[in-house]
Design a protein with these regions (language model features):
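RNA-interacting cores
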Residues: 1-199
Length: 199
């Protein structure tokens, strides 16, 4: 990719091969592994076998400039659908068709017309809102883990999930997403937030 003529404009490296750049002002220096600007959320069930005609609904969350590249993600999913996914049976993987894409429950892309409708599929996430919520006072949080979760703490994996360890992980993720895909690391009082999480 480094010698490619399209390296400066191609979205592949910015989505899949994010360079580990050092930038004092953005907060990137402390980040060992840059986060990808997308999250694919699987369906909220335990279904592992899909028959012909079954629907597979999933969510795609894009961050930062990746939001401008929705058309490329749609195209990529269409290509994956024609190639197929899952275990090969008789030398073939299961093909699928991307039927539609929705944002805020509105159809913004349909296989029928093959066009992306003008839309505002973006929402602004604020790290400050998260911090202010913690400052408002003590409250109960019930957390249900749907998929396996492993968090590293003090250079080791810990089976116990204390709220302050979870808060550290959330703050680290927010910080790295803002540093790489937002407007730089948010001005949060990390130490105070973790202290509050221990209370």
């Amino acid at each position: 990719c480094t010698e490619c003529l399209l390296a400066d404009r191609c979205i592949y490296p910015t989505v899949f091969e994010i360079p580990l750049t050092v930038n004092e002002t953005s907060g990137r220096k402390r980040i060992s592994q840059p986060p990808h600007p997308y999250v694919i959320e699987p369906p909220d069930d335990s279904k592992t076998r899909y028959l012909q005609g079954d629907s597979l609904d999933f969510s795609l969350i894009l961050f930062g400039d990746a939001c401008k590249n929705l058309a490329y993600f749609i195209y990529a999913f269409e290509q994956i659908g024609s190639i197929g996914i899952g275990k090969r049976v008789n030398g073939k993987s299961a093909a699928f068709t991307l039927r539609e894409v929705r944002s805020d429950n509105k159809i913004i892309y349909s296989k029928t017309d093959g066009k992306i409708k003008k839309h505002s599929a973006t929402s602004t996430l604020s790290a400050q809102t998260f911090a202010e919520t913690l400052e408002d006072g003590l409250f109960d949080i019930e957390l249900e883990l749907i998929t396996p979760l492993r968090l590293k703490y003090q250079n080791g994996l810990n089976a116990d999930l204390s709220f302050d360890v979870l808060t550290r992980a959330i703050l680290r993720r927010i910080s790295s997403l803002f540093a790489y895909h937002g407007e730089g690391e948010p001005a949060l009082d990390y130490r105070r937030l973790v202290t509050r999480a221990k209370e």
